[in-house]
């Protein structure tokens, strides 16, 4: 990290800066000053607005009493966007039961006007999504997310006409199921995989790196099931505090498909079979 670049940050008396691994979108650093330790994210060649949605999400988490990093500052230096947050010290272990309770607490926050979406778009390193407010979840999830992913996969040569035929069948099935399901606009993390939570040194769970959205809470829960990191204690505690509706086990596959399509777009052919398997499951399984 260039010292001249660091001089533009609103942090005084920086003693040490060291890279932090784990993400695939941002450069991440631990920054120590004379008085405190901070977490710095940098997105090269992007405007300050790149972090606007994440900042808004973290602020909503704070208002909801969700343990998460607190925003300190954001801005732009030499054409690079940055975000400074409090640094959360990770502990050795924690309670999956408490994590389930925390996510249930997050999802209990409802959009006051009953709208689905968010005040800002999702901006990722490889794709962006329109979050304009909608009256129904299906428009946000299917029209704005899945259809956009389908178009991008086709445009980038990762899907062909045969894939689109299968997708169109899957799409009809998803729409039919969501029209029967009563969705409520809960505050979502938006990217709740195992790498976006941690246990602090006192054992408390914390959430970070949100892609905020008001939507059906099954979206978050479905994403938790793709790559692991969540135990049966997590799901038992979540369902005890905020039980999922009948048929959730089938609908969760919709959100697994979404995440796998995102990964196919980001990482290529290695996820092609996983996406195909997920679409087959949606077509073959029945609501339980």
From Swiss-Prot:
ATP binds at residues 86-88. One of its GO terms (molecular function) is kinase activity. It is an enzyme of class 2 (transferase). The active site is at 191 (proton acceptor). It catalyses: N(6)-(D-ribulosyl)-L-lysine + ATP = N(6)-(3-O-phospho-D-ribulosyl)-L-lysine + ADP + H(+); N(6)-(D-erythrulosyl)-L-lysine + ATP = N(6)-(3-O-phospho-D-erythrulosyl)-L-lysine + ADP + H(+); N(6)-D-ribulosyl-L-lysyl-[protein] + ATP = N(6)-(3-O-phospho-D-ribulosyl)-L-lysyl-[protein] + ADP + H(+); N(6)-(D-erythrulosyl)-L-lysyl-[protein] + ATP = N(6)-(3-O-phospho-D-erythrulosyl)-L-lysyl-[protein] + ADP + H(+). Disulfide bonds: none annotated. Its EC number is 2.7.1.-. Belongs to the fructosamine kinase family. This is Probable ketoamine kinase SAOUHSC_02908.
